């Protein structure tokens, strides 16, 4: 076998190799530089001055600010909204807000939307998804730039309990068919409320729940969980972290889809067995959140009834509050 030509070939390879390494390093550097600029590291990083966080000076000493599973509990004073706003704007985030205005509840819609325009996700892209059986009664509200309203016509039910429980079915259905393509996060809210102070991107997380204003200081034995073992919403007396309100929850669209789908399926199983939980969809929500821990928990600042509970000093702000009403007149 003639080997005389091989050394020449090896010298050629040795000459090409350094050149190839140089090309890879050069273009790799260009790619990483371009990527860092676009991801805000370091080119787009915030230049706003803000107070340095101090390890030995907690933001709040009067309330719990972290769950045992390391999810933050959001209170006034625990976050810097300027930093958060910039981070979510870099991601070009769009937030969906669902609200059900079925039957007489459509009367609350104007105040709900007007106060949302003043306080909800100001400066960010928002799509309001209004579920209603009365599309002609949806009020005209002036919306800010980057914000839009979508009316989704759905059927009503004779009993208000059925209206409440079928909310999970509708959110699940539209999350799969539509919301996944249109928004990054979904916030699910009750119509008979109003925004009274800032509610912004500090609430956004993979999955969040809100502490019920009536039970935030109570022991688990006082929680009004569903206690019948026959129900899919059943929670034993010795279990439970918090009692969450059904009027304000959300997260990524995918996680909200998983939640609402699981709750709806549990409802259907209970219905087949003639069982209706004590607090309807809220009972299923609490069961789900017990075994699928939220990645963020909102304090009662984000769900309050001032008429019933006043304004305790622990609440620095009341952000999302109940509108005074005659429950019987509205529901019947």
UniProtKB/Swiss-Prot annotation:
GO terms for biological process: oligosaccharide biosynthetic process; protein glycosylation. Keywords: Glycoprotein, Glycosyltransferase, Golgi apparatus, Manganese, Membrane, Metal-binding, Secreted, Signal-anchor, Transferase, Transmembrane, Transmembrane helix. CDD domains: Glyco_transf_6. GO terms for cellular component: extracellular region; Golgi apparatus; Golgi cisterna membrane. Binds 1 Mn(2+) ion per subunit. Glycans are attached at residue 92. Disulfide bonds: none annotated. Submaxillary glands (at protein level). An alpha-L-fucosyl-(1->2)-beta-D-galactosyl derivative binds at residues 212, 224, 282, 305. The active site is at 282 (nucleophile). Mn(2+) binds at residues 190, 192. GO terms for molecular function: fucosylgalactoside 3-alpha-galactosyltransferase activity; glycoprotein-fucosylgalactoside alpha-N-acetylgalactosaminyltransferase activity; metal ion binding. The conserved DXD motif is involved in cofactor binding. The manganese ion interacts with the beta-phosphate group of UDP and may also have a role in catalysis. This is Histo-blood group ABO system transferase. It comes from Mus musculus (Mouse).
């Amino acid at each position: 076998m003639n080997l005389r030509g091989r050394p020449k070939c090896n010298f050629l390879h040795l000459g090409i190799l350094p050149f190839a390494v140089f090309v890879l390093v050069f273009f790799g550097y260009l790619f990483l530089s371009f990527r860092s600029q676009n991801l805000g590291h370091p080119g787009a990083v915030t230049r706003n001055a803000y107070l340095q966080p101090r390890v030995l000076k907690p933001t709040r000493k009067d309330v719990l600010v972290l769950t045992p599973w390391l999810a933050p509990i959001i209170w006034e004073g625990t976050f810097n909204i300027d930093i958060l706003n910039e981070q979510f704007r870099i991601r070009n985030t769009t937030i969906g807000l669902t609200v059900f205005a079925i039957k007489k509840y459509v009367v609350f819609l104007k105040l709900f939307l007007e106060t949302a325009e003043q306080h909800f996700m100001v400066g960010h892209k928002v799509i309001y998804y209004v579920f209603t059986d009365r599309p002609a009664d949806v009020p005209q509200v002036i919306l800010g730039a980057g914000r839009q309203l979508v009316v989704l016509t759905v059927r009503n039910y004779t009993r208000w309990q059925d209206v409440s429980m079928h909310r999970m079915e509708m959110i699940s259905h539209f999350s799969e068919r539509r919301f996944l393509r249109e928004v990054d996060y979904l916030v699910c809210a009750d119509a008979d409320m109003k925004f009274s102070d800032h509610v912004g991107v500090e609430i956004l997380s993979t999955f969040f729940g809100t502490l019920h204003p009536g039970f935030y200081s109570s022991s688990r034995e006082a929680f009004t969980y569903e206690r019948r073992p026959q129900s899919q919403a059943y929670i034993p007396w010795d279990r439970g972290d918090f009692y969450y309100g059904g009027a304000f929850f959300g997260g990524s669209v995918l996680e909200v889809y998983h939640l609402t789908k699981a709750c709806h399926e549990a409802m259907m199983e209970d219905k087949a067995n003639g069982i209706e939980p004590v607090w309807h969809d809220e009972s299923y929500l609490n069961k789900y959140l017990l075994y699928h821990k939220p990645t963020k928990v909102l304090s009662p600042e984000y769900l309050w009834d001032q008429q019933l509970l006043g304004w305790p000093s622990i609440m620095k702000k009341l952000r999302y509050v109940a509108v005074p009403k005659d429950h019987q007149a509205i529901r019947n």
